[in-house]
Every structure is written in structure tokens, then in C-alpha cells.
Curated annotation (Swiss-Prot):
SUPFAM superfamilies: PLP-dependent transferases. Belongs to the GcvP family. N-terminal subunit subfamily. Gene3D superfamilies: Aspartate Aminotransferase, domain 1, Type I PLP-dependent aspartate aminotransferase-like (Major domain). This is Probable glycine dehydrogenase (decarboxylating) subunit 1. Signal peptide: none annotated. It catalyses: N(6)-[(R)-lipoyl]-L-lysyl-[glycine-cleavage complex H protein] + glycine + H(+) = N(6)-[(R)-S(8)-aminomethyldihydrolipoyl]-L-lysyl-[glycine-cleavage complex H protein] + CO2. The keyword Lipid biosynthesis does not apply. One of its GO terms (molecular function) is glycine dehydrogenase (decarboxylating) activity. The glycine cleavage system is composed of four proteins: P, T, L and H. In this organism, the P 'protein' is a heterodimer of two subunits.
Length: 452
């Protein structure tokens, strides 16, 4: 919607309609102390465009961009190469919106893109269907928990200790209002996740088991075992994928028995961009189709028998009675979904596998190099492109010391789990196809200096 300025005559006409003699009279109900009567003290006057550009450039020079230093951060947001073609394509006027294509007769291009996106997500996840996107991975995770509750008529969700703590906190926030019980635990610094302990906590009141794949420490759980145990108790397995590139080499969660698969699509096409906006991915078995949150784009034929695309299901509160809605999602992450779809299309199946192999190789090189540093232990026995190291003392300070040496060395578990003293020395390290041998050498050298 374009900004249309108002003239004094426009304002007078509007005030006349509502029966107010002036703008001050219109806002008379607002306490005087809450109204702005003069310029804000200390706020500078306007400046020229060139002066503002220079000022903003000076401020931005204080930032450290992901590509300017050795970068090993991950834990749910990853630095991958995004081809320039992606940004070029999403800036086309036909696509540059996140808004819902309510009128199929004038939105066939957008609807077809969403249909193709759904197909790609379903194939990636190994599920029968996928929706047209959600806001991000954490909200998609909660939507899956809520969906499992509707399906099973149960109110207790079992969350694996390997689930990202921010996803857990998002679920806790929502559960405060829904009354759902969340059975949670913190991860333990072990080479592999304790799947047997998780399975032992499943009972007849469990609606779903939520497992991250790979988990927050980079470990790879046995989804088939957990799926069998959950389904034997009448519960659903929800698998959370925060790094979809991993599915270029790992078996898809759906093929391993997951009932619902959700994830964060940031790795493909979206970029880090200061933490958002990101992209929620959601897929499930076809028999749960009518419980899926958000929107589903489908293929049909028009009155002339020509192929067309429409919003087949939109069981959200704007479309149906609130008490019957499966979700209150509003406009979805359509533009981010387009970027994801373009990037994945450019890669193709073999390209995604190559990207995954390069990321895995970079992580293996990094882990091998760090294992040679005195005082550092690589915790994981198996991993994709992310692993955890145990450091000789508090990892938060070590991360800060590395940053002072212009190396972004990892995410400290003390930051993610500030109440868990047993995790304070842990640091999660990620590598991708962007990681070079020089980056690895710089990390090793900086760590040796910090730990000396």
C-alpha cells in the first residue's frame, strides 16, 4: 500500500465526520502527559540524505559480518552460500510480497510457487504432504505439538533433551495458555543421545515425542527406534530439523517413521540476516491432512479444463470460526519460502547432496584439528556439520576471547543453558561449505592462544 499524504483540507474533512474540531480534541482522551507537545529532547534535527548515509556507514563499520572472519557459529542458524540468482529472482515485482494469494485468478504464479515449495519440502522430509510455510522453526515445532494434541486427544508432550532450548521456550510460552504439559530435560554431554532413556519416558498419556535431528549438540538420534516406541503407546513422533542441508546425506525423517516433520528453512536461500525473518517448514502424513496448520496450496482445473492452483485448505481463524481453526497464523513466510524454493531448485538433488558432503567434510576437518589441541575434547561420535567440544573452562569466556581475536568460534552451551552448570564448558561448533582450511587454521591458532 502506497503512502498517500494528507492535505489540511483532508484532515479537516475527516475531523468533521467524527465530530472533532481539531486533532488535539480528537485525542483528548489520551492523558496530557502521554501526548507529545514538543520535539523530543536530545533527538537531533533532520539531516541530508548524504549525511545520514555517512553516519549509518560509520555505525555499520562496527559490525562483524559472517563472511569477514572465520565463522563457526550454528546452533539453529547457519552460514551457507546463497547464489546471487536467489535475491535477483525474489525481487521480481510479481513475487516481492509475503501476502496471501486470496484471488487465484490473478495469483497463479505465486500459487504455483507455493505448490512447488510444498512438493520440495515433502520430498526433503519424506512426508506425504507439506504446508505453504510457517513463521520459523520454533513456531512450526509448537504447531506440531498442538496438532498432535488434537489428533491424540492427549495433553502431554515429551521433549527430547536434544531439542533446541529456544524451541523449548517457545513451546513453554504457548503451553502457558493451552494448559499442555511439557516433559523436558537438558542434554547431557555424551557421545550419542540416550535414546533408551527417552523411550522409557513415553507412556499412555504422551501425545507426542519431539526429537531434533541432528540434535542441539550435533548428535544423530535413532529415529526409527523412537518412532516405534512412541507409536506403540499411541503417541506421534515429531522430528525437528534445524539444518535442512543435513537431509542431503541423512535419511529423511519420514522414511524413518516420523509422523510430523518440522524445521527451519533458513539454511537454503534465506541467509542469516540478523536472526530473521526465517522460514518454518511443516510436513506430515496424509491422514493428518485436515489437522495441518496454516495453508495448503493444491492443484485443480478451471472451467476450461486448464491446470490451475488454489488454496485448498486454510483452516485458520481468519477463514473459519476461531474455535474450529487449527492455527492463528496470518500472512505466512511466502517470500522466504520462494527464496528457499529457488535455491533448492538451483541445487537440485545432486547439488544438495554435494553441498551436504562439503559441509560434512569441513566439519570433520575442523573436529580433527580441534582434537589435536591440548585441553579440548570432541564429544560427538557421529555428526553432520555440527559437533560439540568440551573445553577446559567456561566456554562463554573462551567464545568472547576468540571474538576479540576476530574468530567467531562457536556457541557456548552456557549461553544456551545458563542454569546448567554441567554444560558450562561445552561449545557447539558448526562448519559449512563456506568454511576454508584457512578458517580452521585460524580457529586452532586462536584457541591455542586463548587456552595457553
Amino acid at each position: 500500500m502506497r503512502y498517500l499524504p494528507l492535505t489540511d483540507a483532508d484532515r479537516s474533512a475527516m475531523l468533521s465526520v467524527v465530530g472533532a474540531g481539531s486533532v488535539d480534541e480528537l485525542f483528548a482522551d489520551v492523558p496530557a502527559e502521554a501526548r507529545l507537545s514538543a520535539p523530543i529532547a536530545g533527538l537531533p534535527n533532520h539531516a541530508s540524505e548524504m549525511a545520514v548515509e555517512r553516519h549509518m556507514a560509520r555505525l555499520s563499520a562496527n559490525n562483524v559480518t559472517a563472511g569477514s572472519v572465520p565463522f563457526f557459529l550454528g546452533a539453529g542458524a547457519y552460514r551457507h552460500h546463497v547464489p546471487a540468482t536467489v535475491d535477483h529472482m525474489i525481487q521480481r515485482g510479481e513475487f516481492l510480497t509475503a501476502y496471501t494469494p486470496y484471488q487465484p485468478e490473478i495469483a497463479q504464479g505465486t500459487l504455483q510457487v507455493l505448490f512447488e515449495f510444498q512438493t520440495q519440502v515433502a520430498r526433503l522430509f519424506g512426508t506425504d504432504v507439506a504446508n505453504a510455510s510457517l513463521y520459523d522453526g520454533s513456531t512450526a515445532c509448537w504447531e506440531a505439538i498442538a496438532m498432535a494434541g488434537r489428533i491424540t486427544k492427549r495433553g502431554k508432550a515429551l521433549l527430547s533433551g536434544g531439542l533446541h532450548p529456544h524451541y523449548v521456550e517457545t513451546a513453554r510460552t504457548m503451553a502457558r495458555f493451552t494448559g499442555d504439559v511439557l516433559d523436558t530435560s537438558a542434554p547431557v554431554l555424551t557421545a550419542a543421545p540416550d535414546d533408551d532413556a527417552l523411550v522409557a519416558r513415553i507412556d499412555g498419556e504422551t501425545s507426542c515425542v519431539v526429537v531434533q535431528y541432528p540434535d542441539i549438540l550435533g548428535r544423530i538420534p535413532d529415529l526409527a527406534k523412537i518412532a516405534a516406541a512412541a507409536q506403540a503407546q499411541g503417541a506421534l513422533l515429531i522430528t525437528v530439523v534445524t539444518e535442512p542441508v543435513a537431509l542431503g546425506v541423512l535419511q529423511s525423517p519420514g522414511s524413518l517413521g516420523a509422523d510430523i516433520v518440522v524445521g527451519e528453512g533458513q539454511s537454503l536461500g534465506v541467509g542469516l540476516q540478523f536472526g530473521g525473518p526465517y522460514l518454518g517448514l511443516f510436513g506430515c502424513r496424509e491422514k493428518y491432512l485436515r489437522q495441518i496448520p496454516g495453508r495448503l496450496c493444491g492443484e485443480t482445473v478451471d472451467a476450461d479444463g486448464k491446470r490451475g492452483f488454489v488454496l485448498t485448505l486454510s483452516t485458520r481463524e481468519q477463514h473459519i470460526r476461531r474455535e474450529k481453526a487449527t492455527s492463528n497464523i496470518c500472512t505466512n513466510s511466502g517470500l522466504c519460502a520462494l527464496a528457499f524454493s529457488i535455491h533448492l531448485t538451483l541445487l537440485g538433488g545432486s547439488g544438495l547432496a554435494d553441498m551436504a558432503r562439503l559441509s560434512h567434510l569441513a566439519a570433520r576437518k575442523t573436529a580433527a584439528a580441534l582434537a589435536q589441541v591440548s585441553g579440548i575434547e570432541v564429544v560427538n561420535s557421529h555428526f553432520f556439520n555440527e559437533f560439540t567440544v568440551a573445553l577446559p573452562h567456561d566456554a562463554r569466556q573462551i567464545v568472547r576471547d576468540l571474538a576479540d581475536r576476530h574468530v567467531l568460534g562457536g556457541v557456548s552451551l552456557g549461553r544456551l543453558y545458563p542454569q546448567e552448570a554441567a554444560l558450562a564448558n561445552g561449545m557447539v561448533v558448526a562448519a559449512t561449505e563456506c568454511t576454508t582450511d584457512e578458517d580452521i587454521a585460524a580457529l586452532v591458532a586462536a584457541l591455542k592462544e586463548v587456552l595457553a
